[in-house]
């Protein structure tokens, strides 16, 4: 189900601003056939010297006395033949001075999809979201036994389930961490528009408007649940945390965008994370071949467009917030009671 993601896309997603100098370091970590890794980097302006690479199964703990590999910075990449059977994190130290932590953003699962780590995003001050702290996913009701093992290995302590009460009852989570919090965000799911699509009253061109309205509705009508979410995020004992909904494309997407915005991640990177879902999900897999949605090309196009995420949905919704509140800072402080002091605490937990 997972589509191959190009280096250029991940370069955007893993853009790293080095706070110590006026250079930028861009790093990407990918798996290659055989389960090994290739780590690629670029430095701006070009940097000479040596990069040392360290490995750990823990995102915040590296043995810097024993490098896994080293390479000339000018080479730009290093193949890593290394397998532990667990998730691996890598710390790159450039010229014994500048360091960047990286890992694979997307974690392949058997039943779950759209599962990814929200680490590795940089804000304007050069602070990086911590790897291994916060994940977003499709519904945990899709978890298989191998998925459950993977989630255990990730050390997941808390799940925040944004699905409706009806969805949770009809499809209970198959992975239950130490604590689960049901926060059923208000708002329509795409599937409620099935009849309008089948009758061709909703066309593909209408979907972007629907997506804008849905995203805005979620933001405007769930402040109580978002406040509860941030309260959980402000307690370091709750981590690692996974947030999930049905497909991980709407409710979880809104929540992830808010969290990244609260950490001062710029809108470009927030949009890139949001749009990544389109590369991780085979939307046609959700439409049975004998489904009425497959009997007509126009209907199929509209329904597929409805399932996809659209850039304008998130930019429109955040622009609307800024227009109403004057700034995202005012929105967090007024609508979500997330004061500057609380945001600083959140940054202490979520950034390094």
List PLM regions with ranges.
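Sec-dependent N-terminal signal peptides
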Residues: 5-14
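Cys-dependent protein tyrosine phosphatase-like superfamily
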Residues: 19-241, 255-352
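Short cysteine clusters
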Residues: 245
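Substrate/cofactor-recognition hotspot
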Residues: 248
């Amino acid at each position: 189900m997972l589509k191959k993601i190009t280096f250029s896309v991940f370069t955007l997603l893993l853009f790293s601003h080095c706070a110590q100098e006026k250079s930028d370091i861009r790093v990407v970590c990918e798996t290659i056939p055989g389960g090994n890794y290739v780590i690629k980097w670029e430095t701006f302006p070009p940097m000479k010297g040596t990069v040392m690479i360290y490995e750990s199964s823990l995102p915040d703990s590296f043995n810097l006395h024993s490098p896994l590999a080293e390479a000339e910075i000018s080479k730009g990449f290093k193949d890593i033949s290394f397998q532990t059977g667990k998730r691996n994190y890598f710390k790159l130290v450039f010229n014994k001075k500048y360091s960047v932590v990286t890992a694979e953003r997307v974690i392949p699962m058997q039943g779950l999809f759209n599962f990814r780590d929200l680490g590795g995003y940089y804000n304007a001050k050069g602070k990086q979201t911590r790897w291994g702290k916060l994940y977003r996913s499709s519904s945990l009701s899709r978890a298989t036994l191998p998925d459950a093992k993977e989630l255990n290995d990730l050390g997941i302590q808390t799940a925040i389930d944004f699905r409706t009460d009806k969805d949770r009852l009809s499809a209970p989570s198959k992975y239950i961490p130490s604590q689960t919090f049901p926060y059923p965000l208000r708002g329509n799911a795409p599937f409620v528009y099935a009849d309008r699509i089948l009758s061709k009253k909703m066309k593909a061109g209408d979907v972007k408007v629907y997506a804008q309205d849905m995203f805005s509705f979620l933001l405007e009508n769930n402040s109580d649940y978002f406040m509860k979410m941030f309260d959980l995020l402000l307690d370091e004992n709750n981590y690692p945390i996974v947030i999930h909904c049905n497909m991980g494309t709407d409710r979880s997407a809104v929540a992830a965008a808010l969290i990244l915005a609260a950490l001062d991640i710029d809108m470009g990177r927030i949009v890139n994370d949001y749009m990544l879902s389109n590369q991780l999900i085979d939307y046609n897999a959700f439409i049975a071949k004998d489904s009425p949605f497959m009997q007509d090309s126009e209907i199929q196009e509209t329904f597929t467009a409805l399932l996809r995420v659209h850039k304008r949905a998130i930019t429109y919704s955040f622009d609307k917030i800024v227009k109403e509140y004057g700034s995202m800072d005012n929105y967090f402080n007024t609508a979500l009671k997330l004061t500057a002091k609380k945001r600083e605490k959140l940054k202490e937990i979520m950034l390094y």
